Amino acid sequence: ILLDVPERGYKVKRIVVYPYQRFSLQYHKKRTEHWSIVSGTGTITINDKEYDVSVGSNWVILPKAIHRATAGGTDDLVFIETQIGNCDEDDIIRLEDDYGRVETK
């Protein structure tokens, strides 16, 4: 976490996705995320559409948009994530996860 200002509703993180790894397929109910790619290449999925990403790419993920980031090649995919809105961890709804973090009800 680079910056966390909960009373103002924003948080800034440096996110690293290791080569050939991916994040959970997830969405948020109450936050918008801005992703700025600073290193590496990969793909992001937003609402069933895949996009190639590289250094300089910028993306906006709106509330309820289903999304994930995947690193490609042999380098880490690194991006700066700015969260606006409800930045609590309980606003992460995981649909698929390679690490067993999907909650079933």
Question: What is each PLM-predicted segment?
Answer:
Residues 1-12, 22-25, 92-105:
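A short, N-terminal "cap"/entry segment at the start of jelly-roll beta-barrel domains
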Residues 3, 13-15, 23-29, 36, ...:
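Short histidine-centered beta-strand/loop micro-motifs
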